Swiss-Prot record:
It comes from Daucus carota. The keyword RNA-binding applies. PANTHER family: 30S RIBOSOMAL PROTEIN S14, SMALL RIBOSOMAL SUBUNIT PROTEIN US14M. Residues 1-22 are annotated as: Disordered. Keywords: Chloroplast, Plastid, Ribonucleoprotein, Ribosomal protein, RNA-binding, rRNA-binding. Transmembrane segments: none annotated. This is Small ribosomal subunit protein uS14c.
Length: 100
């Protein structure tokens, strides 16, 4: 189980990313349209003004039940350990164990 503070920090980053997403997208679109170099530098400065934690690269997928940051399956939102336990307990419909 991940510490509560790490999970809260990740939730805060998600909210910040949603808040500043439109600003980042519009300034990136402006950079592609502007031709003069000095204007581009001004827009780059504006792009650097939002907080660092609002960048989408700072986000990390976490397990829905445990908060584990590694070995996550996107389809289920679970880590590999929990996914395996739930499949063995028949809690995930449509998921089958491999046996050969």
């Amino acid at each position: 189980m991940a510490r509560k503070g790490l999970i809260q920090r990740e939730n805060k980053r998600q909210k910040l990313e949603q808040k500043y997403h439109s600003i980042r997208r519009s300034s990136k679109k402006e950079i592609r349209q502007v031709l003069s170099l000095s204007d581009k530098w001004e827009i780059y400065g504006k792009l650097q003004s939002p907080p660092r934690n609002s960048a989408p690269t700072r986000l990390h997928r976490r397990c829905f039940s445990t908060g584990r940051p590694r070995a996550n399956y996107r389809d289920f939102g679970l880590s590999g350990q929990i996914l395996r336990e739930m499949v063995h307990a028949c809690l995930l419909p449509g998921a089958t164990r491999s046996s050969w």
